[in-house]
Amino acid sequence: FLFSCFFYSMYSLILCGGSGTRLWPLSRKNFPKQFLNLFNNHSLLQGTFLRAQKTTPTEKIFFITNKDNFFNVYNQLQELDKDFDKKQIIIESTNLNTAPAVTLAVKYLVETIKVDPEEIVTVLPADHYIEDEEKYKNLLLEAEKNIGDNIGTVGITVLKPHTGFGYIKKGENQNIFYN
Protein backbone atom coordinates (compact mmCIF):
# COMPACT_ATOMS: atom_id res chain seq x y z
CA PHE A 1 0.00 0.00 0.00
CA LEU A 2 1.15 3.51 -0.76
CA PHE A 3 -0.05 6.21 1.61
CA SER A 4 -0.97 9.19 -0.50
CA CYS A 5 -3.97 10.76 -2.17
CA PHE A 6 -5.59 10.76 -5.61
CA PHE A 7 -8.78 12.68 -6.26
CA TYR A 8 -11.77 10.34 -6.24
CA SER A 9 -9.85 7.11 -6.58
CA MET A 10 -7.90 6.63 -3.37
CA TYR A 11 -9.06 5.34 -0.02
CA SER A 12 -9.02 7.36 3.19
CA LEU A 13 -8.52 5.78 6.58
CA ILE A 14 -9.46 7.94 9.56
CA LEU A 15 -7.94 7.02 12.91
CA CYS A 16 -10.38 7.72 15.76
CA GLY A 17 -9.54 5.37 18.60
CA GLY A 18 -7.85 7.78 21.00
CA SER A 19 -8.81 7.88 24.65
CA GLY A 20 -9.07 11.66 25.04
CA THR A 21 -7.40 11.95 28.43
CA ARG A 22 -5.21 14.99 27.66
CA LEU A 23 -8.14 17.42 27.30
CA TRP A 24 -9.94 16.35 30.46
CA PRO A 25 -12.50 17.43 31.64
CA LEU A 26 -13.81 18.41 28.18
CA SER A 27 -12.82 15.08 26.71
CA ARG A 28 -12.87 11.79 28.54
CA LYS A 29 -12.58 8.07 27.87
CA ASN A 30 -16.19 7.64 26.73
CA PHE A 31 -16.17 10.90 24.70
CA PRO A 32 -12.63 11.71 23.46
CA LYS A 33 -11.66 15.01 21.84
CA GLN A 34 -12.35 13.84 18.28
CA PHE A 35 -16.09 13.95 19.13
CA LEU A 36 -16.02 17.50 20.51
CA ASN A 37 -17.09 20.64 18.64
CA LEU A 38 -14.08 22.81 19.44
CA PHE A 39 -13.82 25.17 16.46
CA ASN A 40 -17.15 25.25 14.59
CA ASN A 41 -20.48 23.42 14.26
CA HIS A 42 -18.80 20.09 13.57
CA SER A 43 -16.76 17.80 15.78
CA LEU A 44 -13.12 17.17 14.88
CA LEU A 45 -14.19 13.74 13.57
CA GLN A 46 -16.91 15.26 11.39
CA GLY A 47 -14.49 17.89 10.11
CA THR A 48 -12.02 15.16 9.15
CA PHE A 49 -14.77 13.24 7.34
CA LEU A 50 -15.85 16.35 5.42
CA ARG A 51 -12.20 17.08 4.55
CA ALA A 52 -11.70 13.50 3.35
CA GLN A 53 -14.74 13.81 1.08
CA LYS A 54 -12.87 16.52 -0.85
CA THR A 55 -10.36 13.92 -2.07
CA THR A 56 -12.16 10.59 -1.62
CA PRO A 57 -15.66 9.30 -2.44
CA THR A 58 -17.65 8.49 0.71
CA GLU A 59 -17.75 4.76 0.00
CA LYS A 60 -13.93 4.70 0.13
CA ILE A 61 -13.64 6.44 3.50
CA PHE A 62 -13.07 4.06 6.43
CA PHE A 63 -12.71 4.67 10.16
CA ILE A 64 -10.85 2.66 12.76
CA THR A 65 -11.89 2.98 16.38
CA ASN A 66 -12.36 0.90 19.51
CA LYS A 67 -15.58 -0.82 20.58
CA ASP A 68 -16.26 1.86 23.21
CA ASN A 69 -16.41 4.59 20.56
CA PHE A 70 -18.17 2.74 17.73
CA PHE A 71 -21.53 4.41 18.39
CA ASN A 72 -19.95 7.84 18.85
CA VAL A 73 -18.36 7.48 15.40
CA TYR A 74 -21.48 6.05 13.77
CA ASN A 75 -23.87 8.61 15.27
CA GLN A 76 -21.69 11.55 14.30
CA LEU A 77 -21.35 10.27 10.74
CA GLN A 78 -25.10 9.71 10.52
CA GLU A 79 -25.60 13.40 11.33
CA LEU A 80 -23.72 14.23 8.11
CA ASP A 81 -24.70 11.30 5.87
CA LYS A 82 -27.75 9.15 6.68
CA ASP A 83 -26.54 6.54 4.15
CA PHE A 84 -23.11 6.04 5.74
CA ASP A 85 -22.50 2.29 5.97
CA LYS A 86 -21.37 1.04 9.38
CA LYS A 87 -19.25 -1.58 7.57
CA GLN A 88 -16.89 1.32 6.94
CA ILE A 89 -16.12 1.48 10.66
CA ILE A 90 -13.41 -0.98 11.67
CA ILE A 91 -13.32 -1.93 15.35
CA GLU A 92 -10.06 -2.63 17.18
CA SER A 93 -10.38 -5.40 19.75
CA THR A 94 -7.93 -3.47 21.95
CA ASN A 95 -6.44 0.02 21.66
CA LEU A 96 -3.54 -0.52 19.31
CA ASN A 97 -1.92 2.90 18.73
CA THR A 98 -1.19 4.16 15.23
CA ALA A 99 0.97 1.59 13.39
CA PRO A 100 -0.94 -1.53 14.52
CA ALA A 101 -4.28 0.23 13.91
CA VAL A 102 -3.25 1.14 10.35
CA THR A 103 -2.04 -2.42 9.78
CA LEU A 104 -5.35 -3.86 11.02
CA ALA A 105 -7.33 -1.45 8.85
CA VAL A 106 -5.29 -2.20 5.71
CA LYS A 107 -5.71 -5.93 6.36
CA TYR A 108 -9.48 -5.36 6.63
CA LEU A 109 -9.52 -3.39 3.37
CA VAL A 110 -7.58 -6.06 1.48
CA GLU A 111 -9.11 -9.21 2.98
CA THR A 112 -12.70 -8.18 3.73
CA ILE A 113 -13.49 -5.33 1.34
CA LYS A 114 -11.24 -6.88 -1.37
CA VAL A 115 -9.32 -3.69 -2.08
CA ASP A 116 -6.38 -4.16 -4.45
CA PRO A 117 -3.15 -4.06 -2.36
CA GLU A 118 -1.72 -1.56 -4.88
CA GLU A 119 -4.41 1.02 -4.09
CA ILE A 120 -3.38 4.33 -2.58
CA VAL A 121 -4.51 5.07 0.98
CA THR A 122 -4.22 8.26 2.96
CA VAL A 123 -4.24 7.95 6.75
CA LEU A 124 -5.82 10.85 8.64
CA PRO A 125 -6.05 11.42 12.39
CA ALA A 126 -9.61 12.35 13.43
CA ASP A 127 -8.52 14.83 16.07
CA HIS A 128 -6.54 17.39 14.08
CA TYR A 129 -7.65 20.90 13.23
CA ILE A 130 -6.65 22.08 9.76
CA GLU A 131 -6.97 25.84 9.37
CA ASP A 132 -6.45 26.13 5.60
CA GLU A 133 -8.38 23.15 4.27
CA GLU A 134 -8.04 24.16 0.61
CA LYS A 135 -4.25 24.34 0.90
CA TYR A 136 -4.24 20.97 2.70
CA LYS A 137 -6.40 19.37 -0.01
CA ASN A 138 -4.15 20.76 -2.75
CA LEU A 139 -1.06 19.51 -0.91
CA LEU A 140 -2.49 15.98 -0.77
CA LEU A 141 -3.46 16.06 -4.44
CA GLU A 142 -0.01 17.32 -5.42
CA ALA A 143 1.64 14.68 -3.22
CA GLU A 144 -0.33 11.94 -4.97
CA LYS A 145 1.07 12.99 -8.32
CA ASN A 146 4.63 12.87 -6.99
CA ILE A 147 4.62 10.06 -4.44
CA GLY A 148 5.58 7.19 -6.77
CA ASP A 149 6.31 4.05 -4.74
CA ASN A 150 7.21 6.07 -1.65
CA ILE A 151 5.44 6.61 1.64
CA GLY A 152 4.77 10.27 2.38
CA THR A 153 3.99 12.29 5.47
CA VAL A 154 2.69 15.81 6.00
CA GLY A 155 4.25 17.87 8.75
CA ILE A 156 4.29 21.38 10.14
CA THR A 157 7.10 23.57 11.42
CA VAL A 158 7.27 23.15 15.18
CA LEU A 159 7.19 26.12 17.53
CA LYS A 160 8.79 24.34 20.50
CA PRO A 161 9.95 20.80 21.36
CA HIS A 162 7.44 18.36 22.81
CA THR A 163 8.00 14.77 23.94
CA GLY A 164 4.54 13.72 22.68
CA PHE A 165 5.33 14.35 19.01
CA GLY A 166 7.57 12.80 16.41
CA TYR A 167 9.76 14.98 14.24
CA ILE A 168 10.63 14.91 10.55
CA LYS A 169 14.17 15.61 9.40
CA LYS A 170 13.83 17.29 6.02
CA GLY A 171 16.19 16.36 3.24
CA GLU A 172 16.89 18.17 -0.02
CA ASN A 173 14.20 20.66 -1.08
CA GLN A 174 12.16 19.43 -4.05
CA ASN A 175 9.74 22.34 -4.60
CA ILE A 176 7.09 21.73 -1.89
CA PHE A 177 8.48 18.26 -1.15
CA TYR A 178 11.64 17.14 0.60
CA ASN A 179 13.65 13.94 0.22
Please report, for each region that a protein language model flagged, where it lies by residue:
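Conserved core of the sugar-phosphate nucleotidyltransferase
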Residues: 131-179
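Gly-rich Lys/Arg/Thr-decorated short loops/hinges at beta-loop-alpha junctions or inter-strand turns
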Residues: 25-32
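Conserved N-terminal catalytic core of the sugar/cofactor nucleotidyltransferase
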Residues: 7, 11-14, 25, 37-120, ...
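Short acidic donor-binding/metal-coordinating loop in glycosyltransferase active sites
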Residues: 126
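Short clusters of hydrophobic/aromatic residues that line enzyme substrate/ligand-binding pockets
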Residues: 23, 35, 45, 168, ...
